[in-house]
Amino acid sequence: MSSAVTMRSTTPVEAGLAASGLGFERPVPEGGYRWWYVDGFSDCGQFGVTLIAFIGSVFSPYYYRARHRGRGQAANHVSLNVILYGPSKSRWCMTERGDTALQQSPERLDIGPSALRAYDSGLE
C-alpha cells in the first residue's frame, strides 16, 4: 500500500443508512443470502482486517449442497468470517452455525457468541 493512499471512513448516518438501517432483521429467502462486509486498515497501512457476516453462507459447501437438494434455508447456514492481513502472513477464521445461533433485530445481528451492532455513530 502506498503512503499516498488516504483511507476514509464513514458512519451509517454519513452513508445515508440511518433511516433504512442495515437490514439485520430482514428475512432471507430460501436458497438466498445476505451479507455485511467491512474492511479496515491500520494507520501505517501494513495491517488490515476484513469482517463478513453471512446469512446463507456463500462460501459454505454445506449450504451449496442443501440448496441443490431443495433444503436451502439461509438461516441454517450463518457465519462470521474474519481475515487479518499483515506484511508477512494473513490469517482467517470462519465458523458456520445453524439457525439456533442466529438472532436478528434492526440494530443487532448475533451469530453464536459474535455480534454486529449498528449505531448512528458506526458499527461495533
Predicted regions located by residue number:
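Targeting-peptide/extracellular-domain and disordered-appendage signature
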Residues: M1-E124
